[in-house]
Design a protein with these regions (language model features):
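N-terminal "domain-start" segment that seeds a small globular fold
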Residues: 223-261
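Short, structured interface segments
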Residues: 95-121, 206-232
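A short, compositionally biased domain-edge/stem linker segment
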Residues: 16-20, 115-122, 228-234, 253-257
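Central antiparallel beta-sheet cores of small beta-barrel/beta-sandwich binding domains
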Residues: 24-90, 119-199
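Alpha/beta-hydrolase fold active-site loops
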Residues: 265-268
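Bacterial Sec-dependent N-terminal signal peptides
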Residues: 1-27
Length: 271
């Protein structure tokens, strides 16, 4: 996969050399799309402030990006913190290229053009999903299913919110209810999430996409009083134990135990 990614970058650089005119990102609002399947695109929006600075928007979240490199007719946008790159050719204020996470060997087709609209709306929302939702991901697969809590705020067609899980959340989600269709997305470089589904005032049945490498179904029902289990209850000692107890060999074959003198009266972190 790394070989394929290298070929993609070389091909893009070669196309740059065929055109000597230097191109830059034009100021303004853009709508980007990641082609995560044959039928689904994951949209997000960003604003170019100048040739070297842009802002990615996900609901209340604003991600400032300032590592932008130009080579003739192409741009290479390095997302902050994460090992992620948007590499694209610039033509008539339109971008065509790939979203690349080289460390994980992932490549997703990427396009962007001038627009402020994240999701198109064609119909009045037939449901309002503001509130709390008791959610189950992969409900029909015993080894994969897990619980979550959907928390949303809807104003007309526009929706923001997230899914909370026992170990975190699904970032800042932004989207719409279009008739009975729900669509939510977020993109920050490390995470590229899309949620689609059918909604009523009391139920949601949909699909969660993570980039182009993972998808799973989910169901949700409105429950104003729903709470996730306490985070303090996720890790516990088995019955009959009042502390951790283990012994294992270190790199030199010496036995290491939590009861060794060197650990007494010290804070020990076990991962």
């Amino acid at each position: 996969m790394k070989y394929i990614i290298t070929l993609l970058l070389v091909a893009l650089l070669f196309s740059c050399q065929e055109k000597s005119t230097q191109e830059f990102l034009a100021f303004g609002d853009y709508r980007a799309e990641l082609q995560i399947s044959k039928t689904e695109v994951l949209p997000f929006t960003f604003k170019v402030k100048d040739a070297n600075n842009l802002t990615v928007f996900n609901a209340e979240e604003k991600i400032e990006v300032n590592e932008i490199e130009y080579r003739n007719d192409s741009v290479f946008i390095n997302m902050p913190v994460f090992e992620a790159l948007l590499a694209a050719k610039i033509e008539n204020q339109t971008l065509n290229g790939n979203f690349i996470i080289e460390g994980k060997g992932r490549v997703v087709p990427f396009t962007a053009k001038k627009s402020k609209t994240r999701f198109n709306v064609e119909a009045k929302a037939e449901a309002n999903i503001t509130g709390n939702w008791e959610t189950l991901f992969s409900p029909d697969t015993a080894e994969d299913k897990y619980i979550a809590k959907g928390v949303f705020k809807q104003n007309g067609n526009q929706v923001t919110g997230t899914f909370l899980t026992e170990t975190g959340d699904y970032r800042f989600l932004e989207g719409v209810v279009n008739g009975t269709d729900l669509k939510l997305s977020t993109f920050d470089g490390a995470h590229a999430f899309l949620f689609t589904g059918k909604v009523t005032d009391s139920t949601i049945n949909g699909t969660f996409f993570s980039g182009n490498h993972w998808k799973e179904p989910f169901t949700a029902k409105r429950n104003a009083n729903y709470k996730l289990p306490s985070a303090n209850a996720l890790t516990y000692l088995n019955e009959g134990y009042d502390s951790l107890a283990f012994t294992f060999p270190d790199a030199n074959g010496n036995q290491v135990s939590l009861t060794d003198d060197r650990f007494k009266n010290k804070v020990v972190i076990v991962q």
